[in-house]
């Protein structure tokens, strides 16, 4: 029997640290980031079908979806007109800084490569990923990675210990391009401490990471959406929360929490405040087959 469908779990990411190191002549920002897979995922089903590419993802359906564009690039490279249906069950919030669209695109590439019996090498898939968006390369790899360039150049780091996380997202999101524009007005370029991150991660203790949490986009996004600053400040007051940071360009804020029980208690407080809340943890790897 010929396999005609592959299912993937596409995992979200957080940025444990993000420094903007410069701006290229083409306008893209260069960065250094410690990127980390977490246990929130979208479920992706990719099916060989008739009638071109179709992408079903609620209000995010159609050609603008990054998974659709991933399928377009994949088929174009093969010179194939095979019909593809992509169904995405969305759990990762959008405009949150959690890389949901990038995770879906990476999962689509991986599923298609399996369906077509691996016509592309890992390096060739990375090349597609770089064309699609800065976070897609990380989502292909997953785990704990040091990202440079515009986010597409990856270097492995020691796996993060299993860290209990609470994620809180305001109703309003932050547009990534707007966050970078706001940074350009007032932000200053900086660098992360690679050796410090290696040492902290190798220690296996969540507490070791707290002094290194950092995000150059945080002040810019907080200016666009001041509620982010309030969420972070309130989260830091909760019993068991060791540290908190906005992920990516926001608007989601994550808290590193000592125990899962404490994380659930913190989540209950924020649910009573009518916030979008998730209790999750770090993952040693990224997307997996269903």
Curated annotation (Swiss-Prot):
InterPro entries listed in its UniProt record: GHMP_kinase_C_dom (IPR013750), GHMP_kinase_C_sf (IPR036554), GHMP_kinase_N_dom (IPR006204), IspE (IPR004424), Ribosomal_Su5_D2-typ_SF (IPR020568), Ribsml_uS5_D2-typ_fold_subgr (IPR014721)
Cite the GO molecular-function annotations of the record.
4-(cytidine 5'-diphospho)-2-C-methyl-D-erythritol kinase activity; ATP binding
Which pathway does the UniProt entry assign to this protein?
Isoprenoid biosynthesis; isopentenyl diphosphate biosynthesis via DXP pathway; isopentenyl diphosphate from 1-deoxy-D-xylulose 5-phosphate: step 3/6
Pfam families xref list: GHMP_kinases_C, GHMP_kinases_N
Which Gene Ontology BP terms does the record give? isopentenyl diphosphate biosynthetic process, methylerythritol 4-phosphate pathway; terpenoid biosynthetic process
Give binding positions for ATP. 93-103
EC number of this enzyme: 2.7.1.148
Q: Which reaction does it catalyse?
A: 4-CDP-2-C-methyl-D-erythritol + ATP = 4-CDP-2-C-methyl-D-erythritol 2-phosphate + ADP + H(+)
Key words, A-Z: ATP-binding, Isoprene biosynthesis, Kinase, Nucleotide-binding, Transferase
Catalytic residues in the record? 13, 135
The domain of life for this entry's organism is Bacteria
Top enzyme class: transferase
**Record's family?**
Belongs to the GHMP kinase family. IspE subfamily.
PANTHER family with a match to the protein in the record: 4-DIPHOSPHOCYTIDYL-2-C-METHYL-D-ERYTHRITOL KINASE, CHLOROPLASTIC
Per the entry, what this protein does is:
Catalyzes the phosphorylation of the position 2 hydroxy group of 4-diphosphocytidyl-2C-methyl-D-erythritol.
Family annotation (NCBIfam families): ispE (TIGR00154), PRK14608.1 (NF011202)
Tell me the protein's name. Answer: 4-diphosphocytidyl-2-C-methyl-D-erythritol kinase
């Amino acid at each position: 029997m010929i396999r005609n469908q592959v299912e993937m779990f596409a995992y979200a990411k957080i940025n444990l640290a993000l420094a903007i190191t410069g701006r290229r002549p083409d306008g893209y920002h260069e960065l250094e980031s410690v990127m980390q897979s977490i246990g929130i995922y979208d479920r992706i089903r990719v099916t060989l079908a008739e009638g071109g590419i179709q992408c079903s993802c609620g209000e995010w359906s159609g050609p603008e979806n990054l998974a659709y564009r991933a399928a377009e690039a994949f088929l174009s490279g093969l010179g194939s007109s095979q019909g593809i249906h992509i169904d995405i069950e969305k759990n990762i919030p959008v405009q949150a800084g959690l890389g949901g669209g990038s995770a879906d695109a990476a999962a689509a590439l991986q599923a298609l490569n399996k369906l077509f019996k691996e016509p592309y090498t890992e390096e060739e898939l990375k090349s597609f990923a770089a064309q699609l968006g800065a976070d897609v390369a990380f989502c292909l790899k997953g785990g704990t990675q040091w990202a440079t360039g515009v986010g597409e150049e990856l270097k492995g780091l020691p796996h993060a210990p299993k860290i209990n996380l609470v994620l809180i997202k305001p109703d309003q999101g932050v547009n990534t391009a707007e966050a970078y524009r706001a940074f350009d007005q007032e932000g200053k370029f900086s660098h992360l401490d690679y050796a410090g991150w290696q040492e902290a991660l190798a220690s296996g203790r969540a507490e070791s990471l707290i002094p290194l949490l950092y995000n150059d986009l945080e002040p810019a996004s907080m200016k666009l959406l001041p509620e982010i600053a309030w969420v972070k400040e309130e989260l830091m007051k909760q019993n068991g929360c060791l540290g908190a940071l906005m992920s990516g360009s926001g608007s989601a804020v994550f808290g590193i929490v000592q125990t899962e029980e404490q994380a659930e208690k913190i989540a209950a407080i924020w649910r009573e405040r009518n916030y979008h809340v998730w209790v999750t943890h770090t993952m040693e790897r990224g997307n997996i087959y269903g």
